[in-house]
């Protein structure tokens, strides 16, 4: 495949056209009066969204050089989304402003390396100042404000705040599509895993089709149980106590399963068998989690423990266990709180070390199950199109809220960036480095300017007034009033604002120091014979 190469000014100009096309499509969504963008889908209804990263990922341009520029900015949105989960539109707006301003100066003869140094210096100062003015998030109300601003919906803000209150800041909050029109919250207390009963004959509540065990003993093993003789000694001990038994094993089958079912039907005693969750090493870890939560032990030959010699002291306890066809929920395990805390810290340490997104998700899930529970937000809407859009907004709001809990909040609506303006302007720099600082100064005005423009106002007027206002005072584009942003509940997570600025600066610096661009040369369509081979072009 032949390649086409463009150099210096020509290369940067071609890429800038791509940057502008993508950024112009994304930035119309910024602020409380931002518009939506409609994305064509090959199958199903089109997607209507105001989520920056979703729009950026969809854009592919025909010209390969323009496309490279667009992809660079899409990378800013994507990276910000990965780190902070929101702020992707702000990051795109900042990147476009830095690239455009930087390119003007490079064209006028400035040294890109000097500009890069200036940009990096200015961003470092801005980030330090953002951290200094950041306020920790306190109480349910603050959480609701952050979520409501991100989702542009107060009801969603309240739902997310309630979910975080119920399952804690480390709890898992998942999104599901609801069958109805309303969006509601469902909280699963205790530990739940996706394995149901081994036989429907084990159910105790025929109406709900579930087995409910009150104050049961819990046998946890990684072995397959097919011979009833293996578990007979422990069954006899449990029967003497007059309590039900939950068996979590690799599998329960054959004679063992039949005996448990027959005794349940006769009313002799109640035992419910479920398969162990997970696979391989993850299964071992999850069984250990369950054992610690319930105060039991994992009966495993690897640990030198045999089923036949198991006593009642090795079994776990819980106040209640509910087993459905698909899930098992253990409520109020009787484990030692110190051991549970130590296990949680161990999982946190693993979380910090892992680089795999999949592993991270699984570890967070385990952490939440030990820490207190899982909240499910069931998203409802009138149409499929509205449902997709609403789900994306709630996802952003959820990420935004987590980021706020982590690093605190700053004034929203682009005000925080304007509040660091004077600190950045005071940086002492010379020559091209000073130009780099000025580029960042111009860029941090851009989010406010764009929010105002999307609200149908003159952005420059708002920006100039903001420079002379006291820190924290900003423009509420939703109402057209000047207010104390934090008191009015218009806030952004510090992590989101910081990540947007850092990622935009990183890509802008790379862009400005680009001197050559290599792309595949488009193949020319030779035309002529369009028939099948050996058919002489006739069809």
Swiss-Prot record:
The family database entries (Gene3D superfamilies) matched by this protein are listed as: GroEL (3.50.7.10), GroEL-like equatorial domain (1.10.560.10), TCP-1-like chaperonin intermediate domain (3.30.260.10)
Can you tell me which residues bind ATP? 29-32, 86-90, 413, 476-478, 492
Could you give a single Gene Ontology term from the biological process aspect? protein refolding
Tell me what reaction this enzyme catalyses.
ATP + H2O + a folded polypeptide = ADP + phosphate + an unfolded polypeptide
Q: Domain of life, per the record?
A: Bacteria
Q: Which InterPro entries match?
A: Chaperonin_Cpn60_CS (IPR018370), Cpn60/GroEL (IPR001844), Cpn60/GroEL/TCP-1 (IPR002423), GroEL-like_apical_dom_sf (IPR027409), GROEL-like_equatorial_sf (IPR027413), TCP-1-like_intermed_sf (IPR027410)
Q: What class of enzyme is it?
A: isomerase
NCBIfam families in alphabetical order: GroEL, PRK00013.1, PRK12849.1, PRK12850.1, PRK12851.1
**Protein's job:** Together with its co-chaperonin GroES, plays an essential role in assisting protein folding. The GroEL-GroES system forms a nano-cage that allows encapsulation of the non-native substrate proteins and provides a physical environment optimized to promote and accelerate protein folding.
Assembly and binders: Forms a cylinder of 14 subunits composed of two heptameric rings stacked back-to-back. Interacts with the co-chaperonin GroES.
Task: Please give the name of this protein.
Answer: Chaperonin GroEL
What is the species of this protein?
Answer: Parageobacillus thermoglucosidasius (Geobacillus thermoglucosidasius)
